[in-house]
Amino acid sequence: MRCPYCTGESAVIDTRELDNGETIRRRRRCKHCDRRFTTYERVESVNVMVVKKNGDREPYDREKLLRGLRVAAYKRPISADVIDTLVTEVEAALIAYDALEVPSSVIGEQVMERLRSLDEVAYIRFASVYRSFSDLGKLREAVEELMEKE
């Protein structure tokens, strides 16, 4: 693999399995500039179309889900590894759903179910975008619902 810093060839110096063997993490060292970097390998197993609320269809995009979760978890005590694991769990649920098309609501509910127990602030942030709260009253209802379940 080419070095992202100088485009020289690299060598693997460490390999580890993550996410119960679903992901392989490799530490690499460039043979030219001697800098180190990390790569990840994972099987692209989720091959479904997401049906949006407006009826549009688009291919499932892991990176899009990761971006949304990173925004929700911004400045919260949630590591990148935890977010990655959450997305892997959601993908496992999508595979179990066993359909060629999945409503975006299924993905959103899977994420919110996991975020609720992980971090309440990140949950509310994600829910505010996912559920498109139109006013403060709707947001208040979501917060009150969260507080009742404690």
Curated annotation (Swiss-Prot):
Residue pairs linked by disulfide bridges in the UniProt entry: none
GO biological process, one term: negative regulation of DNA-templated transcription
UniProt keyword Transcription, yes or no: yes
Named cofactor requirement(s): Zn(2+)
Domain ATP-cone, first and last residues per copy: 48-138
Cofactor descriptive note: Binds 1 zinc ion.
GO molecular function: ATP binding; DNA binding; zinc ion binding
Residue ranges that the Swiss-Prot or TrEMBL entry lists as coiled coil: none
Record-linked Pfam families: ATP-cone (PF03477), Zn_ribbon_NrdR (PF22811)
Zinc finger regions, unnamed: 3-33
Family that this chain belongs to: Belongs to the NrdR family.
UniProt-recorded name of the protein: Transcriptional repressor NrdR
Organism listed in the record: Herpetosiphon aurantiacus (strain ATCC 23779 / DSM 785 / 114-95)
